[in-house]
UniProtKB/Swiss-Prot annotation:
Disulfide bonds: none annotated. This is Uncharacterized oxidoreductase Rv2073c. NADP(+) binds at residues 11-34. Pfam families: adh_short.
Length: 249
């Protein structure tokens, strides 16, 4: 079922490039909610969604790392706008791998935002959608989590955990009327990777959003972006470890 026109679409991480691009593609005829820190500064993002055809755009304060606020936020969104049709988890951080290797607090901060906070919010959202008997969840994993590399193992391990959790949650939701889409993009050329040398098969936020929107409409469970990464990682998983540990980012 495509709920995007029938119930609110909520973008958690409404200031992210991928989240913003995906929101524009889901906006036509929909009630949109952008949730992010400093929500009073989302005027430009809200205007873009109105221009894309949203019938209403709301903003909500959201700090992904404030786990205690997740449940009340989801409950208040349902109370104000009705059952959530589509929830997109577009927040996350890359962090500094070199720093994280010696700074435990920084390593934990990366894992907290990219895994723990996602698990918390997904659990609250899944419970609310189960109650409603419908809804769609969109989770952004990464190929960095398919086989974790030495070059970015802190971020990669968080994404590996998220991918596993989301896969299990999708199975748990089977038959409930709630579906979950896992997007697995490769290197994304954007603000978060500014200054870094793009990896092979890199993509833009626009391309990630377009592929994710198509997969959502078509009822897919997983989408690799670009698709060629899927067979590539089938092969990469077979590389001996002594070769794999020398792989660049």
């Amino acid at each position: 079922m495509d709920d995007t026109g029938a119930a609110p679409v909520v973008i958690f991480g409404g200031r992210s490039q991928i989240g913003g691009e995906l929101a524009r593609r889901l906006a036509a005829g929909a009630t949109m909610v952008l949730a992010a820190r400093n929500a009073d500064q989302l005027a430009d993002q809200a205007a873009a969604l109105r221009a894309a055809g949203a019938i209403a755009v709301h903003t909500r304060e959201f700090d992904a790392d404030d786990l205690a606020a997740h449940g009340p936020l989801v409950a208040s969104l349902v109370a104000e706008h009705g059952p959530i049709g589509t929830a997109v988890l577009a927040f996350g951080i890359l962090g500094d791998q070199a720093r994280a290797e010696t700074d435990a607090a920084h390593a934990v901060a990366i894992v907290h935002t990219d895994y723990v906070a996602q698990v918390s919010l997904l659990t609250h959202l899944a419970a609310a959608m189960r109650t409603a008997g419908r809804g769609s969840l969109v989770v952004f994993s990464s190929v960095a989590g398919i086989r974790v590399r030495r070059a970015n193992y802190v971020y990669g391990s968080a994404k590996a955990g998220l991918d596993g959790f989301a896969s299990g949650l999708a199975d748990a939701l089977h038959g409930t009327g709630v579906r979950l889409l896992i997007a697995r993009p490769g290197f994304v050329i954007g603000r978060m990777t500014e200054g870094m040398t793009p990896a092979p098969l890199s993509v833009t936020p626009e391309r990630v959003a377009a592929a994710t929107a198509r997969a959502l409409v078509n009822g897919k469970r997983v989408v690799w972006i670009p698709w060629a990464l899927r067979p590539m990682f089938v092969a990469l998983r077979l590389l001996p470890r002594f070769v794999w540990r020398r792989m660049p980012r």
